[in-house]
């Protein structure tokens, strides 16, 4: 983290725009390091943040709103320039937060949602019956990815979410009793003594 903080300071001094990509849990570590050093940055105005993996494995939960607040407070990157990615090893395609696209297309007040390329569809299913839920209700996320031509094209997850218009989803968490999964969990392994 020390080297990253030094590089952020250097980028800030030069006014460089940077792209920070990482698992959400690593950003939580960066935020803690910034606070520990009493340091906040004002990165170049074209700087962007892309995070993935959610807050799994964190000792202290970090909500999406808190994450966006920390990006602004500690990095100087506004929330509309922070993009969340949702994907998994089993899928060839990913979903991305709509905020940046919404901003550039004049939809600034549209609800944040995870949008996908046209070949990826997600259905929201009742956990007990696997029937589709009513519009707006939460359920298990079932992804149909046509890019998975060489393997299975349908992946039923233990992620709970809901459909969000237009053409998006919101991930709410994991099904009760489902083990945590994802790249955010790897950081805990890396940081373990």
Regions of interest found by a model, annotated:
Residues 1-193:
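Active-site glycine/GP-rich loop and adjacent strand/helix microenvironment
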